[in-house]
Design a protein with these regions (language model features):
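Internal glycine-rich, Lys/Arg-flanked active-site/core loops of soluble domains
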Residues: 34-180
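Conserved NAD+-utilizing ADP-ribose enzyme module
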Residues: 1-43, 179-222
């Protein structure tokens, strides 16, 4: 199965980080998309080709975002690239030397996401094995990577296959990026770095191969 933003391949991708690995990105200036990825050329194959595509195809009709902010979201959602995977892999290292080349893009991308209205909705995300034991009792998990979810469960199930864990997440601060995505039909909602998650109820098992786990986002002030 090809890489997909809605599916994780191991539980560490969700829960390893327990501190803010991007502290200081806020000090970066807001650059153009081209300038924001210059330090990534040696890290992400063909990144400038993807930028060129994003600058041609991004949503140019929004009054919410600048052209470069809109293109940054488009870049993140281009299918078949290693961009989103490389970004989240860097975030999960918690290593500032690894993350610093990403700071300019993070500044542009997060600036764009923060301009979008927050949505309260039930969204869906998957992991391709039984991960129900990760979430126990009232334990709160902090996700420092960007977590892509969908408001359409079928968009996630089509990538998950016949086994794994499907998360139904009640979010309170999700960012609906469908209007700016390269794949608008996926109805994507992004959970921002630092999102706090806990289990809401017991998981549901289907034939001991497929699990549904109900999670909820917790307000950062709770």
């Amino acid at each position: 199965m090809s890489k997909n933003r809605f599916i994780d391949e191991n539980s560490s991708e969700l829960r390893d980080a327990n501190r803010n690995p991007i502290f200081g990105y806020e000090d970066s200036p807001v650059l153009t998309l081209e300038e924001s990825v210059k330090k990534l050329i040696s890290l992400v194959p063909r990144v400038m080709d993807y930028v060129t595509t994003a600058k041609k195809k991004f949503n140019q009709h929004s009054s919410l975002l600048t052209r470069d902010e809109s293109a940054a979201i488009y870049l993140y959602t281009i299918s078949g690239t290693s961009f989103f995977e490389s970004l989240n892999k860097a975030l999960r290292t918690e290593d500032r030397n690894t993350l610093k080349p990403w700071f300019p893009f993070l500044k542009l991308f997060i600036t764009a996401l923060e301009k979008l209205p927050s949505v309260r909705a039930t969204v869906w995300r998957g992991i391709n094995f039984d991960d129900t034991l990760t979430f126990v009792d009232d334990e709160i998990h902090i996700w420092w990577s960007f977590n892509s979810c969908s408001e359409d469960v079928s968009a996630v199930k089509s990538f998950l296959g016949d086994s794994g864990t499907l998360f139904a997440i009640e979010v309170i601060d999700g960012k609906n990026i469908a209007e700016f995505s390269a794949m608008p039909d996926e109805k994507e909602v992004v959970l921002m770095p630092g999102t706090r998650i806990k289990r809401k109820c017991e998981s549901l098992s289907i034939d001991d191969r497929f699990f549904i786990l109900h999670l909820e986002e917790i307000n950062s002030q709770t």
